[in-house]
C-alpha cells in the first residue's frame, strides 16, 4: 500500500510549495537534500556487506548487475556505463537493466515495471550465474520488475542485494542483503527522483567505487585503470603518472607511450626502472594491484 511508504507521505514543510518564490523553493530543496547523506550514513554497515559480496564476484570473474525501473533503473545504468572509462573494465563486468529495455531510459514504457517476468528474461539473456551479484534498486521497495529479477537471481544461486528508500521494503524479502535508506517525504509528494534518487546515486557510487578499489583498480587515490578515450583522459593519464611517481610531465608522457598507454604499467616502469614487459608481468603476479607489484 502506497500510503504506508514514507516516500509517499506529504512533507509538512512544503505544504505551500506552489506559493513559494523561486528562492524559497530552492532553499527548501537544499535543506531536504542535506538530510540524504545522513540517511545514507546510517546504512554504511549494510553497504559494506554488499561491497564485500561484489568484490567476491569480481574475484571469481563474476559480474555486478543492477536492475530497476524508472529513475532507479536509469541510475543503475548510469553507474554501470561509467565503470569502463573510470576503471578500465569491459562493458560486461558491470551492467544495468531497466524495465522496458534501453528505450525506457529516455521514455517511459507503460506497465513494464509491473511485470516480474521481464526481469527474468533480461537476466537470462546475459546467462546470469552463481558467480554474479544482482542488486535490485527501487525507491518504493515494491517494484514487481525488481522482485522478479531478485527471485530469478536467487534461483540460479547468484548473490542478491536490494537498495530501497523505505524501511521493511517488500524487495528486502527477496534479497540476501538489504540497504534501506529512509529518505522520508519529498518536497514534491511522491517524486522519488528527488531525495530518494539522490540517495540511490550515493549508494551506487559507494558500491562501485569501493568494489573497484577492492580489486586493484586504484593506486593511492588515483584511478590508474582509466581508459584514455579522449584528449582530456589522455592528459589525466599522464598527470596520474606524474602524481604517482613524482617524475616530470615529459618523463611521464614518455613512459605512458612506452607502456602503450597503460597507466599502471607506466607507473611500475618508472618506480622500478624496468621495461614494459617486466612491468606487465609484475602486475599480473600482483593481480593488478600496483602497490603489490612494487
From Swiss-Prot:
Q: Give the reaction(s) catalysed.
A: N-acetyl-D-muramate 6-phosphate + H2O = N-acetyl-D-glucosamine 6-phosphate + (R)-lactate
**Active site: residue positions:** 82, 113
Question: Pfam families per the record?
Answer: GKRP_SIS_N (PF22645)
- Locate the SIS domain: which residues? 54-217
What class does this enzyme belong to in the EC scheme? lyase
Q: Does the keyword Lyase apply?
A: yes
Annotated GO MF terms = carbohydrate derivative binding; carbon-oxygen lyase activity; ether hydrolase activity
Identify the EC number(s): 4.2.1.126
Question: Hey, what's the signal peptide range on this chain?
Answer: none
Q: In which pathway does it act?
A: Amino-sugar metabolism; N-acetylmuramate degradation
An example GO BP is: N-acetylmuramic acid catabolic process
What keywords are annotated for this sequence in UniProt? Carbohydrate metabolism, Lyase
PANTHER family attached to this UniProt entry:
GLUCOKINASE REGULATORY PROTEIN
* Complexes and interactors: Homodimer.
Q: What else is known?
A: A lyase-type mechanism (elimination/hydration) is suggested for the cleavage of the lactyl ether bond of MurNAc 6-phosphate, with the formation of an alpha,beta-unsaturated aldehyde intermediate with (E)-stereochemistry, followed by the syn addition of water to give product.
The UniProt entry's sequence similarity note says: Belongs to the GCKR-like family. MurNAc-6-P etherase subfamily.
Q: What does this protein do?
A: Specifically catalyzes the cleavage of the D-lactyl ether substituent of MurNAc 6-phosphate, producing GlcNAc 6-phosphate and D-lactate.
Q: NCBIfam families, alphabetically?
A: N-acetylmuramic acid 6-phosphate etherase, PRK05441.1, PRK12570.1
Protein's name in the database: N-acetylmuramic acid 6-phosphate etherase
What is the species listed in this Swiss-Prot or TrEMBL entry? Bacillus anthracis
Higher taxonomy: Bacteria, Bacillati, Bacillota, Bacilli, Bacillales
Q: Which gene encodes it?
A: murQ
Amino acid at each position: 500500500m502506497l500510503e504506508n511508504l514514507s516516500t509517499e507521505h506529504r512533507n509538512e514543510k512544503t505544504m505551500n510549495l506552489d506559493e513559494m518564490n523561486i528562492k524559497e523553493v530552492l532553499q527548501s530543496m537544499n535543506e531536504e537534500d542535506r538530510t540524504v547523506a545522513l540517511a545514507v550514513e546510517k546504512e554504511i554497515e549494510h553497504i559494506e556487506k554488499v561491497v564485500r559480496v561484489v568484490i567476491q564476484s569480481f574475484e571469481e570473474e563474476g559480474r555486478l548487475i543492477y536492475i530497476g525501473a524508472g529513475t532507479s533503473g536509469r541510475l543503475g545504468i548510469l553507474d554501470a556505463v561509467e565503470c569502463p572509462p573510470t576503471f578500465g573494465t569491459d562493458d560486461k563486468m558491470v551492467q544495468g537493466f531497466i524495465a522496458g529495455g534501453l528505450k525506457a531510459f529516455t521514455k517511459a514504457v507503460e506497465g513494464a515495471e509491473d511485470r516480474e517476468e521481464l526481469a527474468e528474461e533480461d537476466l537470462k539473456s546475459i546467462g546470469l550465474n552463481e558467480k554474479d551479484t544482482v542488486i535490485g534498486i527501487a525507491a518504493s521497495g515494491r517494484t514487481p520488475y525488481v522482485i522478479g529479477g531478485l527471485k530469478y537471481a536467487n534461483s540460479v544461486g547468484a548473490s542478491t542485494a536490494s537498495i530501497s528508500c523505505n524501511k521493511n521494503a517488500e524487495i528486502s524479502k527477496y534479497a540476501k542483503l538489504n540497504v534501506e535508506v529512509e529518505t522520508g517525504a519529498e518536497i514534491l509528494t511522491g517524486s522519488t527522483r528527488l531525495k530518494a534518487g539522490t540517495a540511490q546515486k550515493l549508494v551506487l557510487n559507494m558500491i562501485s567505487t569501493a568494489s573497484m578499489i577492492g580489486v586493484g583498480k586504484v593506486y593511492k587515490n588515483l584511478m590508474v585503470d582509466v581508459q584514455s578515450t579522449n584528449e582530456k583522459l589522455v592528459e589525466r593519464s599522464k598527470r596520474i603518472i606524474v602524481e604517482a611517481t613524482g617524475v616530470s610531465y615529459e618523463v611521464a608522457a614518455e613512459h605512458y607511450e612506452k607502456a602503450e598507454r597503460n597507466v599502471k604499467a607506466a607507473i611500475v616502469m618508472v618506480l622500478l626502472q624496468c621495461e614494459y614487459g617486466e612491468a606487465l608481468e609484475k602486475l599480473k603476479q600482483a593481480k593488478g594491484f600496483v602497490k603489490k607489484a612494487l
